[in-house]
Amino acid sequence: LNLNLGTLNQKKIPAMQKAGKMANKLGHVVVLDPVGVGASSFRKQTAEQLLKEVRFDAIRGNISEIKTLASLCGTQEKNSGNMAVSDTMDVEKITDKSDHCGKITGIDGSGRGVDADNADTVTEENLAQHISNAKMLSKKLQTIVAITGAIDLVTDGSSCYVIRNGNPQMGHVTGAGCQLSGILTAFLAANPENKLQAAAAAVCMMGCAGELAAEKSGQSGSGTYRVSLMDAVSCMDGDILERGARYEIR
């Protein structure tokens, strides 16, 4: 089950809660994609509700989305300074902290709609700190945390895969991250005994597909690249992934 906040509205919240709880009861994989969680209080409150009521096997988002989740676990009433979007629908105010949320030092969230804030970008210079923060959040939430961007991080709180696959054009394709969350869910469901490795493989796969799409589309533009990306995902196999995956474990 992949719970995605991308097209969130009031009516979808009970459905996501019920689906998540039932998936937990049945022992099915549940993944959270907190799309644009830092963009409005409505999205933040919904994410808080889901984190409190549903046990997630993995959470995948860009760095700003993950940092916002971390700030929610740290201080429930904390607001982002970049909350430029306001949803008109209200949700019931949450007054109880989730048992698995606690103060996470050094992590604060900002957002730019569904895009990562440039100031949050994971770079070689700040990589060690981001790895530390990601591991801390993973331990607090007791779930795999996958942070995707120019450098991808996938951690279970103990080990962290640092993945360097991908192409800058992927950031110009709306829905590429959501596509990855679907792939991640499928990989986890197929490999329930090796969830960290499965999550890392999913992220590597999407990055490899992005590289192959860039080779195929050349300078044709983002429309051609989008189609080439979907083609590359559909044509991916184990051999291509093994040859193309670039990662280290820290």
Regions inferred by a protein language model and the residue ranges of each:
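Short, structured active-site "lid" loops
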Residues: 1-11
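Structural motif
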Residues: 1-2, 28-31, 56-59, 143-146, ...
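Glycine/small-residue-rich loop that forms an oxyanion/phosphate-binding "nest" at active or ligand-binding sites
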Residues: 12-61
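Conserved phosphate/ATP/ADP-binding segment of small-molecule kinases
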Residues: 42-160
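Short, small-residue alpha-helix embedded
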Residues: 68, 174-204
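Short, well-structured alpha-helical segments that form the helix of a local strand-helix-strand
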Residues: 133-138, 195-210, 229-230
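Short pre-catalytic strand/loop immediately N-terminal to key active-site residues, enriched for Gly-Thr
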Residues: 163-175
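Charged C-terminal helix
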Residues: 208-250
